[in-house]
Curated annotation (Swiss-Prot):
Pfam families (alphabetical): UPF0179
Organism whose genome encodes this protein: Pyrobaculum calidifontis (strain DSM 21063 / JCM 11548 / VA1)
Classification of source organism: Archaea, Thermoproteota, Thermoprotei, Thermoproteales, Thermoproteaceae
Region (Disordered): 146-184
Positions with biased composition (Low complexity): 146-161
UniProt protein name: UPF0179 protein Pcal_2106
Amino acid sequence: MKRIVTLVSREQAEVGHRFRVFGIPDECRECRLYSVCLGRLTPGRSYIVVEVRPSMGQKCKITGGEMVPVVVEETPIVGLLPLNKALEGVVVTYEDECAGCDGCPSNMVSKGEKIKVVKVLGRAKCRGREFAIVEFYALGAPSLSGASSAGISQAPSRVPLSKPPSKSPSPQKSSPRGPTSRLP
């Protein structure tokens, strides 16, 4: 996957740390560091820190904490797809056939967006239909119009993934620690 250089808090600057970008606060958009911080990340997507670079003493406009340059990679999304689309390596159009169940990725992927299935993890039922539990990458940025109704909050902007994806995905919860927070 593509590597991105961005900024995270000192506490998050650990190789292996995972976080999800939920939204971008207005204060961030006005910050001089925006283009090298949250401006490089996509709301609704999850990332893992793969490299920590030397700090340059940058401070966050919101938290006042030190921001550290890191290299991140987008992590695959775990969700449900119809069985006929669940083939490893295939690129398909996400149609939002499974909307409303715990494993549905509708708050991270937009209807009509192209996705690439990377791994089939198992099977699940949603509203009486059989689906495959899959890991996939979205190939375009999600449309966040109506994001609040899709479960994407505007703050905090980054929250950790509590655990690696399991066979029955559950919604992520936001953290009370501000724009960024650590894994437990």
